[in-house]
Amino acid sequence: MLSTLATIAHAQGGPPFRTDDPDTPGNKHWEINFGWIGDRNPQRGAYQVPDFDFNYGLGDRIQLKYEIPIAIEETRAQPATPTQPAIPGQVIGGLGESLLGIKWRFYEHHPNTSWLKNDFGTGLLALFGHHAPPEPSDPEDLAASASEPATNFSISTYPQLYLDNPTRSVPRGVVAPGPNFFLPIEVNARIGPIRLDGEVGYNFGNHALPQSWGRGLLVGHEFTDRTEAYLELYDEQDANTLPAGQGIGQFATGGPKQRETTLGLGGRQTLNHSKTLNLLLMAGRSFQTITNTNSQPSWIAYVGVQVLLGPAEPVTPQVEQKLPNEGKR
């Protein structure tokens, strides 16, 4: 039996990682992530407790996203220095910003096929029950590809818009002033048993939020269809500076460019027989020197649960392939 791509594709980027990937939930499928997230350095910490992340598959290649956290910002007490007064510690919390996104996997390559044939598309025909048919092949090719993944290379784009909610989270310094637009490109590939995923994106910022680059790389392996682990390198760097007088708390402008570079280890573990409930774990820290004057984190972490919902996937019977001389005696 041949199932659709959505049932074969496995998670890679996305929660619990910062780097995303081209995979989508599948037509009319939900991927819902509940995560407890932390990022702490010697001066401050940022936490989402929890983060609610809702994703819906529109066709085989498009994903709609809405995300909103309960955010907590911690300022750690700092002693006075010859140039700076003492800073009292405080913890504030509130509703975080809303994140709206749409991911489009516009290119995917299947093993044993041309790199240009039938690889571009939207996948929206799946909404009407029309999935891309399997490529015709001879028996030897079918046998060789039986253990191959559905795709071995894909590319997507994932525009995302951050919006402030009608609360006092911005004036209290819980979240950065919005709106902010993030435009990334994601690429993933399989090389033997290794999975690779890369993402590069640009935050366009606003009058109170610097523009910045986000770059991520994931390298890992799927040990079984229930267990996968990855090593992640992620770098976020301001592209400009802003004059003082905008923002509140740690989002106040006027300082030097900031950069955060982290190395993390994480993965996913299926918790039930039907593979609809997954445990998400990731932990890491900066691999650069951590001081009181830079934003390099002493630790980052993600602990969460992923719920997968959706209709049963349609299947099509595999056409029996006869050998050239079969039936001749």
Where do the protein language model's features map onto the residues?
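Sec/Tat signal peptide C-region and signal peptidase I cleavage site
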Residues: L5-A11
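Transmembrane beta-barrel domains of Gram-negative outer membranes and organellar outer membranes
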Residues: A11-N206, S212-G214, L218-R329
